[in-house]
């Protein structure tokens, strides 16, 4: 635990944009060799779940206490994935592989792939407080097959889709979260699948998400609705953005049943 505490203290005080183990150990007075920190993370005797479980319980307990103190019961649950880019020559970290880069692919004729790791994260926002509640590492099916070639049968990995990992985290939150909160779940179009949407609705949670344009609403593709509604007046909706300024949006309201969600 000594090296874990050293790393935690260094992470708190470090102002470096890119934090490496060697860089963190340079901040520590009379620090041991940085390889000790790497070995602690690589061959630690505890599992990720053993560390995550008490953190999740602490976060929910703190969130409930803050809700009672501030009388704020509207909880925003945001779900998103993040791509952490690595050097093109990085090969020996198990989770590193080439992933589709949504950001760099925008506006390009061909998809762009970046060497790195992908993780999914669930964040909670209640009033002025924000929590990094939980996260999961995502491995491509190709990556799982490659890693399993070098593993014993009892230690082999199982491929899981992003939507499956997302639901796993939301199910854990649902089990810990007491009644009384009005919950809004936010995610992008990648997670707008039947299973995840129905799970959220069964809990009485609201969902705010993007939908891919080829999905159907009231038996018509979303991409066709702007033309159909072109004669309908826009509604002006004002929202307070992060810098507390009001921003006006022009929207049209449409109700119907969504179909063709994979």
Regions inferred by a protein language model and the residue ranges of each:
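Active-site-proximal, Lys/Arg-enriched surface segment
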Residues: 8-11, 44-142, 244-254
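A generic secondary-structure signal
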Residues: 27, 61, 65-66, 168-176
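Electropositive, glycine- and tryptophan-enriched low-complexity nucleic-acid-binding patches
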Residues: 35-39, 44-45, 102-182, 261-262
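Gly/serine-rich nucleotide phosphate-binding loop at the start of the catalytic core
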Residues: 1-48
């Amino acid at each position: 635990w000594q090296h874990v505490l050293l790393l935690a203290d260094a992470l708190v005080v470090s102002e470096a944009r890119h934090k490496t183990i060697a860089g963190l150990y340079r901040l520590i007075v009379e620090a041991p060799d940085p390889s000790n920190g790497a070995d602690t993370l690589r061959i630690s005797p505890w599992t990720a779940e053993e560390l995550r479980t008490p953190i999740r319980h602490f976060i929910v307990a703190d969130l409930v206490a803050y809700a009672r103190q501030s009388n704020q019961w509207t909880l925003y649950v945001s779900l998103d994935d993040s791509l952490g880019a690595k050097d093109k020559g990085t090969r020996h970290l198990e989770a590193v592989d080439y992933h589709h880069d949504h950001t760099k692919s925008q506006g390009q004729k061909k998809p762009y792939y970046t060497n790195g790791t992908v993780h999914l994260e669930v964040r909670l926002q209640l009033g002025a407080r924000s929590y990094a509640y939980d996260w999961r590492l995502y491995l491509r099916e190709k990556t799982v097959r490659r890693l399993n070639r070098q593993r014993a049968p009892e230690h082999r990995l199982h491929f899981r889709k992003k939507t499956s990992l997302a639901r796993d985290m939301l199910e854990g939150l649902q089990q810990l979260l007491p009644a009384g909160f009005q919950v809004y779940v936010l995610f992008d179009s990648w997670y707008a699948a039947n299973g995840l949407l129905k799970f959220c609705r069964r809990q009485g949670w609201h969902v705010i998400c993007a939908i891919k344009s080829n999905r159907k609403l009231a038996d018509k593709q979303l991409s066709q609705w702007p033309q159909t509604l072109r004669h309908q007046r826009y509604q002006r909706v004002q929202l307070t953005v992060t810098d507390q300024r009001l921003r006006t949006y022009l929207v049209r309201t449409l109700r119907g049943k969504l179909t063709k969600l994979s």
